[in-house]
Amino acid sequence: MRMRSVASVLALAACLPPAATGQSLDQRIAAVLDAPAAKRASWGILAVRVADGAVLYERNARVPMTPASNTKLVSTALALVRLGPEYRFVTRVLAPDAPDEQGRLRGDLRLVGGGDPTLSGRVVPYSKDAKEGDPLGPLAELADRVVLRGVRVIDGDIVGDATRWPWEPHPAGWAVGDMTWEYGAPVSALTVNDSAVRLSVRPGKAEGEPAAVEFLPPLEPFTVHNTLRTRAGAERRIEVARAPGSSVLEIRGVAPPGGGAAVQWVAVPDPAQFAAEAFALLLRQRGVVIRGRARSLARAPGAPWSEPQGVELARRESPPLAELARIVNKVSQNLHAEMLLRETAHVVRGEGTARAGVEEMAALLKEAGAEEKEFDLEDGSGLSRRGLLSAASLTALLRHMEARGLGELFRSLLPVAGDDGTLSGRFRGVADAAAIRAKTGSLAHVAALSGYAGDDPARRVAFSILVNGYTAPNAEVRALADRIAVEILRESQR
């Protein structure tokens, strides 16, 4: 089939004529699914009225399918239900004792991670127009407070303490290729700048000159093997590679002289070590002498946990959990979803493991009335290829949040169609698109869209659209899912 551009597909979706008068929702959705791209895919769809559960449309609604990032609906709902919307994550700086009269601190200075995903330049609360600030800004605030406590010399090490959760960096089912990049960053209770750095690779200005490599924040979390060649007349080809868990970053390829930098966001292998090095840098910039080194402290799976003790020199509380969940769902932030899940498991079960978190997700789905045979999850973000959810499970969850009195809040955390988050570029030309609030999901051959349609609470519809196994362009399949969502919205307005 002839490939279509993303723009043309979206324009096609926006310019469709309104539903024919008198046609049922079944007939209107059937017309959408008659498209060639739809026929070569597996669809799981359910639309139910939130108020009474009346089924408006269903197709393979109880078949477990790969949900991709629609999994985040479950992990964020779980955090809100178990921890509460006002829950805050705390990062502390501890020392064995207070500094002496000369400002000397004897022993190690410990930066204790509390699972806060906001130790970065990201703006909270979420704003679609916000520009990110200093990636080390929150750590700088902690460093300032340490200096205000009179610390001038540290005889020991700077320790990045990530022992709140066991060190299990990646959930089951994550692709090895994802682990190199920011969206597949390792999960740690001490996370700074989303455990990633901005890598900039700029070819030399003349034949034979080496490429310049820069990191932001300005740290050196990798041993760089740079074999990129600058060659006149060459076609630009710059490759970046890192084996999972390795601190060796390979930069290779060829590029003509000059030209702009190639930019990638690369995950760091040891988030707590990265945090310790960043904190040491900030303290030194403020004139603090550090006799020791920066190092990380982790807890092996199965090892017991005890709350770190010491004199608290500084602390930082995160914004409320609801605002963190908003970021997860609006921009589909994988690492943050996993962090919310681990912290929920830590608080509820006393073990911040992926498995304990997944078991809590299953418990919530069963509380919502979902059938156990219709879901099987492996992570909190949906990056795992092993996760399964049915459309019925997701709509049950969406209705359950309403029943718990969290419906309006949960709905507000989702992308607004045609306006923000991962739906900012979709539903163009639909006048009342903002009445659709939904979470997107995307993996290779997987598309998902689940959420709410309609502004009137009495007529609002919870829906889930899961698409698996397609070979058509992603934009074409998403446009079909969007058309179905619009038809569901129209039904809610009748």
Identify the role of each PLM range.
Residues M1-S5:
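Positively charged n-region of N-terminal signal peptides that target proteins for export
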Residues E58-L78, A325:
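Short active-site loop at a secondary-structure junction
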Residues A7-P17:
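Bacterial N-terminal signal peptides
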Residues G53, K72-A79, I158, L190, ...:
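Residue-level preference for non-acidic, small/hydrophobic
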Residues Q23-A35, V81-K373, D456-P457, A479-R483, ...:
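Conserved serine DD-peptidase/penicillin-binding transpeptidase domain
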Residues S42, L56-E58, V146, V331, ...:
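Small-residue-rich helix-loop
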Residues D34-R59, R295:
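A short, well-structured edge-of-sheet supersecondary motif
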